[in-house]
Amino acid sequence: MIFTLGWASLAAIFTFSIAMVVWGRNGDGSIDL
């Protein structure tokens, strides 16, 4: 349970980091959420 939760949180952080890098490169907030 804890192991699975750890991997899930790691994947979420990794995905969020990639999203922030892409959003930062756009620089104009063109992504609509």
Curated annotation (Swiss-Prot):
Major place of residence: membrane
Signal peptide start-end: none
Gene Ontology annotations of biological process type: cytochrome complex assembly; photosynthesis
Bilayer topology annotation: Single-pass membrane protein
Keyword annotations of the record: Electron transport, Membrane, Photosynthesis, Thylakoid, Transmembrane, Transmembrane helix, Transport
GO cellular component, one term: cytochrome b6f complex
Transmembrane segments: 2-22
GO molecular function, one term: electron transporter, transferring electrons within cytochrome b6/f complex of photosystem II activity
Subcellular location(s) of the protein: Cellular thylakoid membrane
Role description: Component of the cytochrome b6-f complex, which mediates electron transfer between photosystem II (PSII) and photosystem I (PSI), cyclic electron flow around PSI, and state transitions.
Family label: Belongs to the PetN family.
HAMAP family assigned: Cytb6_f_PetN
Subunit structure of this chain's protein: The 4 large subunits of the cytochrome b6-f complex are cytochrome b6, subunit IV (17 kDa polypeptide, PetD), cytochrome f and the Rieske protein, while the 4 small subunits are PetG, PetL, PetM and PetN. The complex functions as a dimer.
Name under which the protein is recorded: Cytochrome b6-f complex subunit 8
